[in-house]
């Protein structure tokens, strides 16, 4: 039994009303007592890449709390929401793509009486390219802004940069040429206090080099004294070819700023602020992050940042819940609200964003809550999960709620519970304690248009019927302990003898970061934390790295790799195939005693090809990367 199956639909007209400005106000707006003005500092015009602070000033004859939504677009073109309704009345914004006339719009609303006002201002961004390329420092001392020339339409332009004295270069993503406007790139992936040479390259549609520009030099600055990083120890040095095809390691250090290092631990990039989680890097040099665990839902946020540290997209749980309240869920009722963003935010191939959020519900259920002295079920708080798809305008276009599709009678396999203030759990509000039913942690859009969802506390990876946005949300299959798949030639242990123990041992458990690899659906990797296996029978067991061949039609999997990783991380973890290599990358994110985190490269034969420990830190995820721009084919 997989719970009730029901289609999540938006209310008629909702998307039409939110696509432009995300509003659904009544005609009383025309008679509102509220006005707003918008000012820019520094004033227009300013060169491309200059950070402009936009300030909204409200005049309102009525009391109440005001929130603000900011949108940006070309002059006489469509506006795109870049910061959805929040309490901040300022928007720092850099016009970093190219020169031109832009418009910035703000809507200020009084949340007490639902009145609003709008203001729009034009702004001119001038070119930094003046017949010659230009290289400009940014607020991040390790990042430069490179401004290159216009070029023939049909070609593409990119930047190649090389540390002085080195023969190893990096290249940015290539963007389409514009015959009249400059091309601008943030250059990231450079060591501190070092000199680099960089030039633009024009390439054809087939990737052939058409011409390259002259070299320009840039000297990176020092990392500020207040920014610190964990001490690292390289246990096994990296070796070619993977040390060349994927020389960068992007770390989401918990309690530190996110950072990218080389394979010796030397910093190449960092984000200037601590965040809740860096979930995924995007092609082109942007990253998705969240800030969770704030009971003020305006400050429970999802954000996208560029390499210079500019926030390019921002929304919050309060705004998401406004949208959910306007969507029809099961039984014709409004959808449940969510409490926080956590664990996953991921840009999809179509430009939409998949994000995981936590929710909760009071249930009266014997399996979840136990029974009273009369044998009647108790009532308790249960933490669930929602999977939301946002369009590029940060508006929900599809939603899935585990309470509607998973079996509430199947509690967490190890009976996990949460108490208020426990940082390892999502926040919750309805009771002093709650059942940590799912603790889901990873989303992937599969090539057939459905969604892979890792549900840690159920010891399952499930596939959800998304059908590229038209699916009904039904669970197509469950892989793992007590699931729908049979493992061919499973691993065994003399410690695990009963059928239940054997099943717990063969499968991944309490897993993290499940993904199909190689652009298909035949090879799946995941990080096996192993909590269930160890609790059932595998005393003193370690984490394992999994790679499986998957036959969906016959519901079978065959192990390619089930590798003992030599340590135990009770939570956190990463698994991936290393770009340009047959080897695997695993991150043991919470190793004890310590704690510390361990990055490992494992060959298909199970040998350790690289190992680096980061002391005194938990690492949510880490990724081996060719550079800060190139990602595997988006799924």
Q: How would you describe each model-predicted region?
A:
Residues 80-88, 173-180:
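Short beta-strand segments within Ig-like beta-sandwich modules, predominantly Fibronectin type-III
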Residues 62-69:
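Solvent-exposed loop segments of extracellular immunoglobulin-like
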Residues 50-58, 143-145:
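A short beta-strand segment in extracellular, disulfide-stabilized domains
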Residues 94-101, 187-195:
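Surface-exposed, short loops/turns at beta-strand junctions within beta-sandwich domains
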Residues 56-62, 74, 110, 148-153:
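Extracellular acidic, Ser/Thr/Pro-rich low-complexity tracts
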Residues 44-50, 134-138:
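Short, solvent-exposed loop/linker segments at the N-terminal edge
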Residues 127-161, 175-184, 191, 195, ...:
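Histidine-/acidic-rich catalytic cores in large beta-rich domains
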């Amino acid at each position: 039994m997989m719970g009730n199956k029901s289609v999540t639909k938006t209310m008629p007209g909702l998307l039409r009303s939110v696509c432009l400005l995300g509003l659904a106000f009544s005609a009383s707006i025309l008679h509102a007592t509220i006005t707003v003005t918008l000012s820019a500092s520094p004033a227009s015009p300013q060169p491309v890449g200059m950070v402009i602070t936009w300030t909204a000033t409200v005049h309102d004859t009525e009391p109440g709390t005001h929130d603000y939504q900011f949108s940006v677009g070309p002059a006489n073109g469509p506006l795109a929401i870049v910061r959805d309704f929040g309490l901040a009345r300022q928007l720092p914004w850099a016009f970093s793509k190219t020169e031109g006339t832009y418009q910035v719009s703000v809507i200020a609303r009084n949340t007490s009486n639902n009145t609003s006002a709008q203001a729009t201002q034009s702004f001119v961004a001038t070119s930094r390219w003046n017949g010659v390329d230009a290289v400009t420092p940014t607020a991040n001392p390790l990042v430069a802004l490179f401004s290159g020339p216009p070029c023939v339409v049909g070609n593409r332009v990119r930047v190649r940069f090389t540390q002085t004295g080195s023969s190893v270069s990096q290249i940015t993503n290539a963007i389409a040429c514009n015959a009249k406007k400059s091309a601008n790139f943030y250059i990231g992936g450079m060591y501190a206090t070092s000199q680099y040479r960089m030039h633009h390259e024009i390439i054809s549609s087939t990737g052939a080099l058409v011409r390259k520009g002259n070299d320009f030099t840039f000297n990176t600055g020092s990392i500020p004294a207040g920014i610190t990083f964990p001490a690292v120890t390289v246990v096994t040095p990296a070796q070619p070819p993977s040390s060349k095809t994927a020389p960068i390691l992007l770390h989401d250090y918990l309690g530190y700023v996110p950072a990218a290092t080389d394979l010796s631990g030397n910093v190449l990039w960092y984000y200037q602020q601590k965040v809740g989680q860096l979930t995924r890097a995007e092609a082109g040099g942007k990253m998705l992050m969240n800030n969770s665990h704030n009971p003020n839902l305006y400050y429970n946020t999802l954000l996208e940042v560029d390499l210079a540290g500019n926030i390019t997209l921002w929304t919050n749980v309060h705004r998401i819940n406004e949208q959910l309240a306007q969507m029809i869920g099961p039984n014709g009722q409004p959808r449940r609200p969510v409490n926080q963003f956590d664990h996953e935010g991921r840009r999809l191939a179509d430009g939409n964003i998949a994000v995981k959020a936590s929710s909760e519900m009071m249930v009266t259920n014997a399996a979840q809550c136990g029974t009273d002295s009369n044998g009647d079920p108790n009532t308790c708080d249960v933490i669930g999960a929602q999977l939301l798809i946002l369009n590029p305008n940060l508006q929900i276009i599809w939603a899935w709620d585990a309470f509607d599709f998973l079996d509430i009678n199947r509690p967490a396999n190890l009976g996990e519970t949460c108490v208020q203030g426990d940082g390892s759990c999502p926040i919750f509000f309805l009771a002093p304690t709650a059942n940590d039913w799912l603790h889901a942690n990873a989303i992937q859009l599969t090539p057939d248009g459905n969604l892979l969802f890792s549900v840690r506390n159920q010891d399952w990876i499930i596939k959800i019927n998304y059908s590229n946005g038209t699916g009904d949300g039904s669970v197509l299959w469950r892989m793992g302990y007590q699931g729908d798949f049979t493992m061919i030639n499973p691993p065994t242990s003399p410690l695990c003898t009963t059928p239940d123990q054997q099943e717990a041992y063969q499968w991944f458990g309490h897993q993290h970061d499940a993904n199909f690899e190689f652009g298909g659906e035949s090879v799946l990797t995941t990080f096996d934390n192993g909590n269930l296996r160890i609790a059932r029978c595998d005393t003193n067991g370690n984490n394992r790295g999994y790679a499986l061949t998957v036959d969906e039609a016959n519901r079978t999997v065959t192990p390619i790799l089930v590798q003992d990783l030599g340590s135990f991380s009770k939570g956190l973890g990463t698994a991936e195939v290393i770009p340009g290599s047959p080897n695997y990358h695993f991150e043991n994110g919470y190793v004890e005693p310590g704690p510390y985190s361990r990055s490992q490269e494992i060959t298909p034969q199970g040998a350790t090809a690289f190992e680096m420990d980061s002391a005194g830190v938990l690492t949510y995820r880490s990724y081996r990367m060719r550079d800060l721009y190139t990602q595997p084919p988006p799924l």
